[in-house]
């Protein structure tokens, strides 16, 4: 689960 998606 990605807490902060890559921009």
UniProtKB/Swiss-Prot annotation:
GO terms for cellular component: extracellular region. It comes from Helicoverpa zea (Corn earworm moth). Keywords: Amidation, Digestion, Hormone, Neuropeptide, Secreted. An integral part of the sensory system that mediates food signaling, providing the neural basis for the regulation of food response; coordinates larval foraging and social behavior changes during development. May have a hormonal role in females. The modification Phenylalanine amide is found at residue 7. Expressed in the hemolymph, midgut and brain. The lineage of its organism: Eukaryota, Metazoa, Ecdysozoa, Arthropoda, Hexapoda. It is found in: Secreted. Belongs to the NPY family. GO terms for biological process: digestion; neuropeptide signaling pathway. This is Neuropeptide F. Disulfide bonds: none annotated. Transmembrane segments: none annotated. The keyword Transport does not apply. GO terms for molecular function: hormone activity.
